[in-house]
């Protein structure tokens, strides 16, 4: 009798555990997806990530799985885990090219790199990646409603890269490395001609030429870009450097 009771108790416990397990396994992908959307709305991003990962793993190839892949990227993006978001968005864009979320995912990849772009004095890898992705976005989605926003971001990122080059040129000037300064200012002129840094590049080039004792070249360059330098109130400073170096050269030859 005692053994019977023990066996009966074990069977009852087994049935309870089995039922509990079946209930958990019985949660549908749609239920888990809905849970993820709810958690995303409530800004419970870690829980949302867990929900969407579950749906992605078990719903591969389904519309629900494709949607979950996008929202998994969203859960990372909204949690400011931008590089992880990029990885998830790229899974969507590579594997699910016909998803209605592809355009937004492509734009969010651009935005993620833009946000990760640091101050100009740091390495600009993410700035360059952002520019590349924004340009690809414009090429692939020429009629997108997001294009104006993309163009504004491109302009801002190009200004940053132009500023970095300008400050590099100024550093060379301080080190009396005038040939290197000239090369840097010329690169700025060639690559970032459409930014506000162009006027400072003109001024820097005049001063680099003058400090390098290339007075004729400095005068010629100043004359060529006089209008822009006068307008930006940088002409007088550039001319002052030429006049100063003229005296130095004259003194050296006497």
Regions found by a protein language model. Give the residues of each.
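Acidic, polar-rich low-complexity tracts and alpha-helical solenoid repeat scaffolds
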Residues: 4-6, 15, 19-254
């Amino acid at each position: 009798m005692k053994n019977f009771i023990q066996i009966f108790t074990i069977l009852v416990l087994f049935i309870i555990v089995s039922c509990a397990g079946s209930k958990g396994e019985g949660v549908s992908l749609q239920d888990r997806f809905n849970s993820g959307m709810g958690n995303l709305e409530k800004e419970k991003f870690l829980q949302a990530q867990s929900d969407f990962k579950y749906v992605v793993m078990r719903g591969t190839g389904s519309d629900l799985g494709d949607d979950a892949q996008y929202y998994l990227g969203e859960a990372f993006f909204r949690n400011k885990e931008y590089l992880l978001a990029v990885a998830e968005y790229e899974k969507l864009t590579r594997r699910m090219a016909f998803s209605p979320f592809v355009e937004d995912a492509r734009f969010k990849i651009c935005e993620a790199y833009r946000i990760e772009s640091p101050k100009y004095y740091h390495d600009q890898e993410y700035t360059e990646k952002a520019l590349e992705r924004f340009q690809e976005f414009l090429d692939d989605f020429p009629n997108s409603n997001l294009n104006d926003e993309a163009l504004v971001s491109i302009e801002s990122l190009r200004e940053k890269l132009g500023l970095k080059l300008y400050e590099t040129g100024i550093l060379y000037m301080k080190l009396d490395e005038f040939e290197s300064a000239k090369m840097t200012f010329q690169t700025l002129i060639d690559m970032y001609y459409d930014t506000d840094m162009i006027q400072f590049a003109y001024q820097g080039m005049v001063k680099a030429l003058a400090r390098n004792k290339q007075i004729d070249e400095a005068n010629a360059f100043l004359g060529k870009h006089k209008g822009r330098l006068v307008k930006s109130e940088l002409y007088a400073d550039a001319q002052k450097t030429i006049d100063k170096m003229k005296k130095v050269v004259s003194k050296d030859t006497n």
